[in-house]
């Protein structure tokens, strides 16, 4: 609070009178009045200034005090909430790990493997203390321990690692339905005194291992102290623990619990379990054959449909090609008809050969087959007249008698010559629109060579 007092308080230095000192006379002003007389005069003004300063002091001091305590509260609250948030995050991560069946399974199998090794070591040490190797062998045979738990059920390199369902109980049901196989459920209770009896005397026994191999059984392990293990236990209506249950596909996509061993290990008999597997295995074989037959029929239908679609596609392609060929032939015939009509019309428009040499051009035309034609043309006509003459000669229409009937020029048809006419010296192609008289190579006379255009 000293800072507020220093900010808004009186800036005058405090004065303490020394005891026994003489009374100091107040100094007089220029008019001869003392300070007391002046103070009496200025007292109303100082009173107003003091009240104004007090009001300003209160207005500025109160918000700053509130802000100070508010910031102090926020800082202290954040320090208290930080450990709580860390604790909440820890329990949240732990809860998420517990919900993951894969992590639960790995932890359960690891614990069972360690405890099984501990039991084996303790039994071996006890037998060595007694000095009897024969008793150790007899105890192992009586207990039925033929394999180590880790060599069988280790999720990474165990014999049955691929048969153990890594995910939820629902995955086991789906796998049994899709693959048409038996499923074995083992619910472990670590709170029991003899909770390792099932592990050592059943799960690791030679008889049980042989049954798992023979019938290609899928395995699912759970812990009743977890939420999923407890849900499975309630769904199967288990009364005692541990549980060894067998599920099988009884009908299409209908899974049933066909056998169970609960509680004391004395309730377990390997021959009874073998009888249950053997009895229901024939039913699974039938279901597998039905599935295979259905799948085979589906594949046959699929192949038939595929062959039918291929045949239909080939027929459609052949029909499409036939239609295209027909259309091309029709278009070619129509084009040939129009071209013949144009040739007849062009023959009717062809000017006769001039009788005199005046204003005429005498040219010698050599065709592609070596034939040589000599003819006179009117020099005032364009060179297209020579092109038309050669075209009619190639179609053998100059000497035909089909020009007796009137022929009209085809509408919307522009004839394209399939050759070009060239003067050899100098070598130059004749332009269709140029007058014959303007071409020095053929007027008044000259030679022309016909060449086919590249298609």
Swiss-Prot record:
CDD domains: UBX. Keywords: Cytoplasm, Ubl conjugation pathway. The keyword Thylakoid does not apply. Residues 356-455 form the UBX domain. One of its GO terms (biological process) is ERAD pathway. Transmembrane segments: none annotated. Present with 233 molecules/cell in log phase SD medium. Component of the DSC E3 ligase complexes composed of at least TUL1, DSC2, DSC3, UBX3, CDC48 as well as VLD1 for the vacuole-localized complex or GLD1 for the Golgi/endosome-localized complex. Interacts with CDC48. Component of the DSC E3 ubiquitin ligase complexes that tag proteins present in Golgi, endosome and vacuole membranes and function in protein homeostasis under non-stress conditions and support a role in protein quality control. Involved in CDC48-dependent protein degradation through the ubiquitin/proteasome pathway. Involved in delivery of substrates to the 26S proteasome. Also required for membrane fusion. This is UBX domain-containing protein 3.
